[in-house]
Design a protein with these regions (language model features):
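Nucleotide and nucleotide-moiety/phosphate-recognizing core
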Residues: 36-125, 133-155, 315
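Short strand->helix junction
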Residues: 88, 128-131, 162, 168, ...
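Generic hydrophobic alpha-helical membrane-segment signal
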Residues: 2, 90, 107, 111, ...
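A short, aliphatic-rich alpha-helical micro-motif
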Residues: 115-119, 174, 294-295, 320
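Short, conserved loop/turn and helix-capping segments at secondary-structure boundaries
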Residues: 92, 139, 171-174, 366, ...
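Small-residue (G/A/S/T)-rich helix-start motifs and N-terminal tracts that mark the onset
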Residues: 1-85, 179, 185-330, 334-345, ...
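Internal gly/pro-rich beta-alpha loop/helix module
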Residues: 119-120, 125-216
């Protein structure tokens, strides 16, 4: 797992070091790390360092200073370095050192002309305080970088992308980072979509900041392997966990099949299908190891593909009152009682959560972490917000967790039904709700990634999981 931090938290940690060491020490550390990455990029993309051209695009703040001091190091290594100052001001000491090292100043027109010869562009325009979008002149240059496919190394973050949410969809004008060099730790824009993809390859540079409190904790594939429940030699089907599933309807029978398949392939010891008879017949035909009869269970999955269910509210209320961990998906999310608890797992996508919170859908996608937290505060339940970044928020836990990211191919009908079943299986195995949610979303993402660059069908995902 790795943490990601807000701008405020990074600045707090930076200020402690600035007070202790001064600005120059931190900036030189950052510049050395940045120069190392640019040199690596030159070797990778151009095959050599000496004599190649690097174009710095620098703003007025410390971000620009980092770029200029890195330019000094590059010039001393034989790189032909030029710089375009995008504003009226510039970091004075860095600019003087850059010129003294043989760096060349360009205006906007000169920078565009130099772009055809540059092996690497360093984006040092804005830093942590940057807003979404770029001034027209800079936006035009950034677009030219994308058109000409010049490698771009961004300093801390791609200019035009804010460090903290909200993240606008589609993204405003920004530099197309091939690589982003982040100082002191990951920022939220480097962990949460759609900003994450705009950052390209991420390289972390340690500049000696102290302990910081993360806003989100991001899961990695190794974490899934470490936490996945594995049966022991004395386990049987009951001790592995029995999950009860009521999903699907005459109009949407496939939802029942998919939710049940997810639970089976995720390793449930037994799956009881307790939904409507017309769906039960289809489920048992596809999955003969499923028991289509009521009985004791350790978790419940409700709502996927229900449509309008006259007895739905009663079923949901009874499940919540029963004290078992419950997954509420899709149509069950419209039938919530006033009182929920942390063992209830809500699995909305952005549209469903927008309706639940009575806010525009765009507000959910722009800041999924805040949206998931708001849902927890409003309902008292644990929330798995599905989407490009899958967010798990839990009552009593300050940090939000992000599942392992997966390919965009998983954005297809049926993914949520499948995920609900996986969640149910992990809950039946005895995992805490928070852990089951992030494990399930991560496992689905990893299974999709194994399918390669083609649109996976949901049963293919389950074949990969199995």
């Amino acid at each position: 797992m790795y943490p990601a931090f807000t701008v405020a938290e990074v600045r707090r940690a930076e200020q402690l070091e600035l007070d202790r060491l001064g600005e120059d020490v931190l900036m030189r550390r950052a510049a050395r790390g940045l120069a190392t990455v640019v040199l690596e990029e030159l070797r990778r993309s151009a095959g050599r360092v000496y004599g190649n051209r690097v174009l710095l695009v620098v703003g007025s703040g410390n971000n620009g200073g980092d770029g200029l001091w890195a330019g000094v190091t590059l010039a001393r290594r034989g790189v032909r370095v030029s710089a375009w100052r995008t504003g009226s001001a510039v970091h004075a000491a860095g600019w003087a050192a850059f010129l003294a090292a043989g760096g060349r100043e360009l205006d906007a027109a000169g920078a565009l002309a130099e772009l055809s010869r540059a092996a690497v562009v360093v984006d040092a325009v804005t830093g942590l305080g940057g807003r979404a979008g770029l001034r027209p002149e800079v936006a035009g240059f950034a677009a030219a970088c994308a058109t000409r496919r010049v490698p771009v190394v961004a300093v801390d973050l791609p200019s035009g992308i804010p460090a903290d949410p909200p993240f606008v969809v589609p993204a405003p004008a920004h530099f197309p980072a091939t690589t982003t060099v982040s100082f002191g730790g990951r920022k939220l824009c480097q962990a949460i979509e759609p900003a994450r993809s705009a950052c390209g390859r991420l390289v972390l540079v340690d500049i000696g900041l102290g302990t910081m409190t993360p806003e989100v904790v991001c899961w990695e594939p190794a974490d899934v392997l470490a936490h996945w429940p594995v049966p022991g030699p004395s386990d049987d089907k009951y001790s592995r966990g029995v999950v009860g599933i009521d999903a699907g309807s005459a109009s949407y029978p496939g939802a029942g099949v998919l939710a049940t398949t997810g639970a089976v392939r995720a390793g449930a010891g037994m799956v009881r299908f307790v939904g409507v008879p017309e769906v039960a017949a289809t489920v048992v035909e596809r999955l003969p190891n499923v028991v289509a009869a009521p009985g004791r269970v350790q978790s419940l999955v409700l709502g996927s593909g229900w449509g309008r269910r006259p007895d739905g509210a009663r079923i949901v209320a009874a499940a919540i009152d029963g004290g078992l961990p419950v997954v509420l998906d899709a149509d069950a999310l419209t039938l919530l009682p006033e009182v929920l608890h942390a063992d209830v797992l809500l699995t909305p996508h952005a549209g469903e959560l927008a309706r639940l919170l009575d806010v525009p859908r765009e507000q959910i996608t722009a800041d999924p972490v805040a949206a998931a937290r708001q849902a927890v505060a409003q309902t008292g339940a644990t929330v798995l917000l599905k989407g490009a970044s899958q967010v798990v928020a839990t009552p009593g836990h300050e940090a939000v967790e992000l599942a392992v990211p997966g390919p965009a191919w998983t954005a297809q009908a049926g993914s949520g039904d499948l995920l609900a079943g996986i969640c149910g299986a992990l809950l039946a195995a005895g995992l805490p709700v928070r852990l089951a949610a992030v494990l399930a979303a991560s496992a689905q993402a990893l299974a999709a990634a194994r399918q390669g660059g083609v649109p996976p069908q949901e049963l293919d995902l389950q074949a990969a999981l199995g």
